[in-house]
Amino acid sequence: MNNTYYITTPIYYVNDVPHIGHAYTSVASDVIARFMRLSGHEVMFLTGTDEHGQKVEKAAIDKNIDPQKFTDQTSQSFRHLMTAMHISNDDFIRTTEERHKKAVAIFWQKLLDNGSIYEGFYEGWYAVRDEAFYDESELTADKLAPTGAAVEWVKEPSYFFNLSKWQDKLLEFYEANPDFIRPISRRNEVISFVKSGLKDLSVSRTTFNWGIKVPNDNKHVIYVWLDALANYISALGYPDQNSNYGKFWPANLQVVGKDILRFHAVYWPAFLMAAEIPLPKTIMAHGWWTNEGQKISKSLGNTIDPIKLIEEFGVDQVRYFLMREITFGADGNFARSNLITRINSELSNKIGNLLQRTTSFVYKNNDGKVPAITQDAINKIYELPLLKTAINSAKQNILLMEKTEINKILDNIINLAEEANIYIDSEAPWNLKKTDPEKMLEVLYALLETLRYIAVMLQAFMPSSAGKMLDQLGVNTEERLFKHLSLEFALTSASDILEPVIVFPRFEE
């Protein structure tokens, strides 16, 4: 069985200021990458920045700065976002890097050699903001792109990619691979778009210079989307089969926003088919966030700065909220009151309360040690409904992640914490201390073991907080994978726990 797992975010456009959408895509991808590592996979997780194109050239000229210097500066804001959000990417690709430029030139040549690129003349509507061409039929009544971007009529020599040739092959591929585009609503949109007819795609420009030159024809710059999409293979070392390209391609999961699904689910697979490269297994399109019910836009001044949120609430709390609040793939609303409610009612009241009550009681009443009980007693504890829920949750979560049902995994974890809180109230170890000290030790062990399950499962979402929980429980750093969630790796009788500290603080409205 192939144990590798390759996941990518889209590469972020350097002209943008990092916002909640970038944070959401990155955190979701990071949760999946961490989850797969915890499952025992060898993971390659890629993110990066898209640094070519007319918009970048114009922004650099406006600032009277060289485009390379401009992108060197602006790409740093995205590196900073990754660090601040605790994103565990294995690589960060920039499209201005030599390794990328070389791979794109080879990719272009392959398409040319295979007869998929030809010279012609482009005339039509182009939106600089979207770096995209639009049909007359796609424009609004005000002659704007569907995204609201201004369009201009351009007429210039161009190389074309024979996209129309791949229409039937794409439809056959979608049919044979129902999981290629997720969620199903987006899959249906893409199929409908392709069925409506594909036109050949202009893949070079001559009206600006900031980009990768077409091999052997430096009057032309390669269309920014062909350049950008190739990052997913250039970062691996394409075309060298002895590099990570041979090891990790095709990608298992490519996470994108729904606004760029067409590029990833139509153009990208067509380019790959034409270059005789295997296609990724799944393109997952997520939704957009609104802010307090309003569409987020610069003009409304209601963009959400993820760095400021982290500074106020903590990185793990923000990560948790982003993954918990909406179904991955659907649109969602950011409401500050909901963020505070989630932190207080779920993290603090349920998980934090369970952790604090249990570890504080053990620390004071059992000399800061895991209860010294027999293996028979531990075996019996594993027959309790509480531990059965814990074991089932761990198994279910693997299946949920296969379907990228991320928020349902958090449902399971919170439900387990709720069940454990009911258990501690009903068993009342503080009373058992006087009436049945032996039973008290068994109850405390069951609670500590349940907390171990919760913490191990929470690591992908809240790596720092879950790590603190596991440290408190005295869990060996080598025994924190999903395979360790079993009786065989249960907490060692009479082992030390650390002095309790608050891991999930409350926040005032």
From Swiss-Prot:
Chain residues that bind ATP: K298
Entry's PANTHER family?
Answer: METHIONINE--TRNA LIGASE, MITOCHONDRIAL, METHIONYL-TRNA SYNTHETASE
Q: What does the entry list under GO cellular component?
A: cytoplasm
| Subunit organization | Monomer.
Motif 'KMSKS' region: list the residue ranges.
295-299
Q: What is this protein called?
A: Methionine--tRNA ligase
Organism source for this protein?
Rickettsia bellii (strain RML369-C)
**Superkingdom classification of source:** Bacteria
What this protein catalyses is: tRNA(Met) + L-methionine + ATP = L-methionyl-tRNA(Met) + AMP + diphosphate
